[in-house]
């Protein structure tokens, strides 16, 4: 299993930096942060130092800002060379039709910021040694690094929710990044207290898998 050394969140351009500052207090314990102004000279030596020891790279930016996008691509190109998983959090509401050099781009706005951060937080936990059942970083990369789209959802539930209700709500609230999906992995990340037993959890997992395509390889943390 690959050792996870570091996760870094970089705010690029005015809007990217503003979003980073907005969420920084929620993630600072687990993620290193960096702010890059569009006037910054982003040369190879700077990017190498930026990526040193990093396994997962998150970038916040507005894809309508062409200068910010150039910086994103410069960092993403070298991240790919170093086999760093790069995920862009694009603040623009418009579809980004420009060439992008990162592994995965997700639209982020005021409505989905908290849920997106929760998913990122759970991904980071899922590949850590402290996780009860961890996922290999290679599986995360394989699931996210593709030219095709992904579908993802997040929900918070308690024992008042039936197993079927949980599976249905997750399916109904799912967001697609494009119509054509990778069809590779079904990743189920669960955070729960000890009041829930393994049998109940197994029912939930089976219900979620029943809602998905049979061709998906399911992995769980």
What are these regions (language model features)?
Residues 1-221:
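Tubulin/FtsZ superfamily GTPase core signature
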